Amino acid sequence: MQQSIRYKGLSLTPDEMAVENGALSLCGNLELHDGALRPSIVTGTPLSQPLTINGVVAKILYVHETGNYRHLIAIASSAIYWFLQDGSLGSTTPIKSFDYEASVLSVNSIGNTLIIVATDGIHYALWGDGGYKYLPQKPPFVEISFSISDDYPENYSNGGVDAEGSTNGFREAFQQTTYSCNDVFNKVKMPFIDSLFKDLECLTIKEDKQSDITQSIYALVNRTNNLIARNGRFYANFFVRYCYRMFDGSMIMHSSPVFIPVQVPDSYMVLSANASQNTTNYLLDTYDDFTFQREDGKGNKSKVNIKKVAFYYYPRNVDLNYTILDSKRDELEEWKDVIKSVDVFITPPITNIDTSEKILSLRSLHRNYKLGHGLLSLTFESNGIRIGDTSVHFPSLSVDAYRNKLKNTSAFYKVCSLKISDLTNYTTKKLPVDKNAVYQVSLQEQMKDDYKTHNSLFAKGSYVYNHRLNLYGMKEKLFQGFNGSVMFPGQYILKYDDSTDNLMYRYKIQKIVVSLNTTSGTKYVESSDKFFSRQDIDSFIISNLVKFYPDSRADKMAIFCKDSSDNDVIFVFPLEQCAELNGAMHMGDFTDNLEQYKVDSFDYTVDDVVELSNKIYTSESDNAFYFPLNGINTVGIGTIQGIASTTRALSQGQFGQYPLMAFSTDGIWAMEVSSKGTYSSIHPISREVCSNPKSITQLDQSVLFATNRSISRIAESQVVSMSDVLDGPGFNIYGLGKFLNFFNDTEEDSDTVKSTKAQMRQLIDFTSSPIEFFQRCQVIYDYKNSRILCLDVTQTSKTSTADTVALCYSIKDNAWSTFLIQNVLTAINSYPHPYIQYRDGSVMVLDKGYDYEDTTEYHGIIVTRTLKFNEDNVPDSITGYIHSLTSGSIPIMWLYGSNDNQNWHYIGRLGGMKSSYMATHSYRFFRIALYLKMKSMNQYFATRLEIIRRFSKF
């Protein structure tokens, strides 16, 4: 009878009786294609020259390709260079040189931005003007200090008061009523001594006049404030904050919100124009008819005559100034392609006034303070009578309500953009605000809050999908924190008057330490204050103004100071998570005493790295520099080893929503893509754990990866092993002595023959377990030839021209084989064509299909698994054979037989195309070994055997 043996690829499963005829114990330099064997050839376009720098091979890391260029990114001697597609060096100046302690983990790109992930952080390089411009891990944070100007005089309304005008403007605005003092006020008795020094209620407003007086005072305040705001100036307290505006409009690296105490503790200072400092019978003297002189903006005096109850408003009318405190502006200039401006945002005016309540009284000697000067005062005298010591007592929020109002202020509106080219170091300038923006501030663009963009990121790898950079295996280095010059205004006096020894209450800030409660334990960050360490800061500022850290996990801030005697002093403030802002802060209510926060010691050690190994950070679309909050996802509890995408939906009928897979130490996870391009949900799909991240390879509709027991692919939601046939021990080829001896060198052999025999011996000697091989190999997808190549990149001890054994998987035929390839340095999957680089620096682009025009003669060998010709296992004899092939070169065939499937007996070596009669012994089992010489156009289809059964069972 005849048996046709069609070969099925490499198989190492232990049970010889379970495998089909045609399975192979050895398949070297041959691969299965459409059911036939053909030479295993790596075809493609070689680069015209190897990648070398001064004779040193540059290892290819990435192919940076856009519609306009294709560059090979490679590393040599810890420096990254770029090469043109032909292999020529693009520039002798490296893109980036690394310390020898750092190593590059991955390289990716989005548009013209190259992203280099290294052990020392994330690095960037922008292509433009014929070269790459290196950018460090983060833009420098330019420290800007804000302050306010002196008050501007203005032509305020006189509100019915008879007053001489001036083109130079005045500092006060008036409002006169139609009532006399007796119509409006009830006088309150004050002890004489207290009336000279204490803040006391001195006048109350009669109940029937409270509404009218309240309306008159607010009319005075509102029209004056509107005039100031229309000029782009400020009259009340507010917060200011700045951030970087990126090329795509994103906002990053927000500053601390800085509270500008234009006037504290009250929001407005409105004074009685009728009440003097004099008293009669412990009652304040008031005057319906009073004339005095005031000064205009240049000190010229003019007359004012009061006829009825009147009030004057001493408003703050100030510019917002800014100062660049460091030299980082020059460093920021390097980022001008990414950072387009420094945008400044403010809040609407914040007051402690409760406008729902009526004004009921006035107080004597009530003190307000203004930033930069201290006590706020405006009095007038005439004939020994002084007015201006009695101020309107505005109904106000409770202390707690005002504190909460300040803490929960979260809406910041844009009033100014500063171009990087306009920034000047160490120079105080007026902030060029948009006047209309200040007047209608709540209609302006609102600041989008920050989420940890000051932190430095470290990753184990990167993956670009959907124009977004995905970083995985994360660590973050916490931001060192803002120093005092960024958190506090740039003016150091606030609560100041002549009765205080102010130097006793001023401190030089040396450093600021913040503690954070993280998943990695308590962390400490430290910021040295080089600027404020030379300045005496009002203790009132330190205790009451904002202390902020841009991370809600922060719980304490310790400020280390020097007092006026140069003694070390430490103040520790509790930080509370902000309700709206991403951060934690402490802020007083302008009654806090700094001494209550004083401590003897604060022990810490700087520890600022947080492990985030199960996080994936996804950037904004087409912006590899910014990772928004909604792009940060947690995947399981393990460490993410790699990411890959698939093009097929995991659930048929759904919106293709799980295109990205994360390979973690606790399994494989699928991530759902939201309409915004970020990942809205994450689901586990397999317990399989990838054991070799270099094996993760995207195929057309699946992803391939290696585990410690197989190489598998995940398609849809199913994980399928591709290497079950390789899970077993290798066959002892040395038991086939005659076959093995054929490839030993003889004296008559030419160098070419010896080289060929050495290659065959290398294939025979490859006894490495494929499963172990998968743990160290690099996998690439040869799309043109529909096969997977598993390449050994660990053969560092071999010469660059030596051959190494690789594994090949034919996707069409589901068949494995081995083949020889020149010693591989690395290989990368770069859509649409992979690249192989050999250890001599030469590079092959696998951009061609199988070359059927190649006239080179290739050599290959196969050894079958046990051949069985009947189920009864009775002895048979092989009496003839025919080779079915298209080659003109005749194969050499060795036949072996066995009765126990263990010990193999040599039957013979046959060199003809066919044989009709062969005298052989009878055996239950057989093996065939073939040595073939084939050109690329040739195929070996099958071996047809003539079988005669010698014995049968009775």
Question: Which residues does each PLM region occupy?
Answer:
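Short Trp-Ser/Thr-centered turn/loop motifs at beta-strand boundaries
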Residues: 249-280, 284, 525-532, 543, ...
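Conserved aromatic anchor
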Residues: 217-232, 284-336
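Hydrophobic or amphipathic alpha-helical targeting/insertion segments
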Residues: 103-156, 160, 342, 346-408
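N-terminal beta-propeller domains
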Residues: 1-92, 144-215, 227, 232, ...
